[in-house]
């Protein structure tokens, strides 16, 4: 009799047990906020979405993002040589402050972390410090009198802004800020010079950013997977994965080989739960005042499999997909409902449209 080996541990069970343990620790607020951020990041990588984690632990999605990013910044502080006092301070508080340092490099984060700890700043001031350091890092040659220390970067920002103000109150506030953060003596002297030099240096205003907004649903397209060109088999229709959109821009993530098409946000398409598209020709459907058959994009909602007598459906006909209308309920399964037939854009004369002057006339 063959002796069976002991049951090997199931990786899926082990992963699920670990996830449940992390959820329990988060629910009971065990550990510090850095560990919470690492636990939430691990859960999200395992497939838990922020809403699931919120319902299981009470951590709101915004808070989840803050502690995840903050814990990553804290790790940068550890690896890049932040002081022990800084690390000890931020291990128990300040996720909102470290979150604001996320756009800096690892080395800049460590230096900025020490600076924010030394000056006991809040999140709003940390955001300004991060911006000052980021802007200062773009200089190939350092401004006269200022070193590459993050304190001098903040001092330079204050010095530059103070020179643009004629209002003495605002100018004095910025000078005080610069003196507070200045690290080098030369930077301090540059700022102190503003106490006797009241010259105002005007700055060219930044251009208006090219913001656009989607005003209607039609303007925001829906990305739909393409099954392929007929003839196709039922298995090919079923093999296309269900698409999950990420709001607010309907972002679609996918790994692997898959064709996609962007369609306008028509209401019937927005209402579809599981739409896919199939490339076909119009002669597969009854003629609708058309002289020549042409290509069409058939949009099918795989979630709608209930028969009615006023719709077309996709079915498996002798091993291949087909589109049919049924006067009575069919005896075989329905694979989806045809919700839209899209014809290509009509171009009257392609040669004419290449020359805009001909169209204008």
From Swiss-Prot:
Origin superkingdom: Bacteria
Pfam families found in the cross-reference section: Raf1_HTH (PF18579), Raf1_N (PF18578), RuBisCo_chap_C (PF18087)
GO BP terms in the entry: carbon fixation; photosynthesis; ribulose bisphosphate carboxylase complex assembly
Location of region: C-terminal beta-sheet: 221-347
Region: N-terminal alpha-helix, residue numbers: 16-197
Keyword terms: Carbon dioxide fixation, Chaperone, Cytoplasm, Photosynthesis
Main location: cytoplasm
Subcellular compartments: Cytoplasm
GO cellular component: cytoplasm
Matches recorded under InterPro entries: RAF1, Raf1_C, Raf1_cyn, Raf1_HTH, Raf1_N
Self-association state and partner proteins as the record states: Homodimer. Forms an RbcL(8)-Raf1(8) complex. Each Raf1 dimer clamps the exterior of an RbcL dimer, protecting it. The extreme C-terminus (residues 354-361) inserts into the catalytic pocket of RbcL where the Glu-361 forms a salt bridge with 'Lys-202'. This insertion probably contributes to the assembly of RbcL(8). Forms complexes of many stoichiometries with RbcL with and without RbcS. RbcX and Raf1 can bind simultaneously to RbcL.
Record-stated family: Belongs to the RAF family.
Primary role: A major RuBisCO chaperone. Acts after GroEL-GroES chaperonin to fold and/or assemble the large subunit of RuBisCO (ccbL, rbcL). Cooperates with RbcX in RbcL folding, plays the major role in assembly of dimers into RbcL(8)-Raf1(8) intermediate complexes. RbcS replaces Raf1, leading to holoenzyme formation. In vitro acts as an antagonist to CcmM35, suggesting it might regulate RuBisCO condensation and decondensation.
Protein name: RuBisCO accumulation factor 1
Origin organism lineage: Bacteria, Bacillati, Cyanobacteriota, Cyanophyceae, Nostocales
């Amino acid at each position: 009799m063959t002796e069976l080996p002991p049951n090997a541990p199931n990786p899926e069970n082990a992963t699920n047990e670990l996830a449940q343990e992390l959820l329990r620790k988060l629910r009971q607020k065990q550990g510090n906020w850095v560990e919470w951020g690492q636990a939430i990041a691990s859960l999200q990588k395992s497939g838990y979405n922020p809403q699931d984690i919120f319902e299981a632990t009470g951590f709101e999605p915004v808070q989840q993002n803050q502690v995840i990013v903050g814990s990553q910044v804290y790790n940068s502080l550890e690896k890049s040589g932040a002081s022990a006092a800084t690390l000890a301070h931020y291990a128990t508080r300040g996720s909102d402050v470290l979150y604001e340092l996320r756009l800096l490099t690892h080395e800049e984060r460590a230096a900025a972390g020490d600076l924010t700890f030394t000056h006991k700043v809040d999140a709003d001031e940390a955001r300004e410090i991060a911006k000052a350091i980021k802007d200062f890092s773009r200089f190939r040659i350092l401004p006269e009198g200022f070193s590459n220390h993050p304190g001098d970067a903040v001092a330079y920002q204050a010095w530059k802004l103070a020179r643009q103000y004629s209002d003495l109150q605002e100018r004095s506030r910025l000078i005080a800020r610069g003196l507070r953060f200045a690290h080098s003596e030369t930077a301090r002297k540059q700022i102190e010079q503003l106490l006797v030099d009241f010259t105002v240096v005007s700055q060219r205003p930044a251009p208006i950013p090219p913001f656009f907004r989607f005003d209607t649903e039609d303007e925001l397209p829906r990305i739909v997977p393409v099954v392929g060109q007929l003839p196709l088999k039922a298995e090919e229709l079923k093999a296309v994965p269900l698409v999950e959109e990420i709001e607010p821009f309907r972002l679609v993530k996918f790994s692997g080989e898959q064709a996609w098409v962007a369609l306008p946000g028509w209401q019937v398409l927005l209402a579809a739960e599981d739409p896919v598209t199939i490339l076909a020709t119009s002669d597969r459907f009854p003629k609708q005042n058309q002289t020549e058959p042409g290509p069409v994009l058939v949009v099918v909602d795989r979630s709608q499999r209930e028969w009615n007598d006023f719709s077309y459906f996709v079915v498996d006909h002798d091993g291949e997909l087909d589109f049919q209308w049924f006067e009575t309920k069919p005896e075989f399964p329905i694979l989806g409902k045809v919700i839209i037939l899209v014809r290509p854009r009509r171009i009257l004369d392609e040669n004419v449209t290449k020359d805009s002057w001909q169209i204008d006339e």
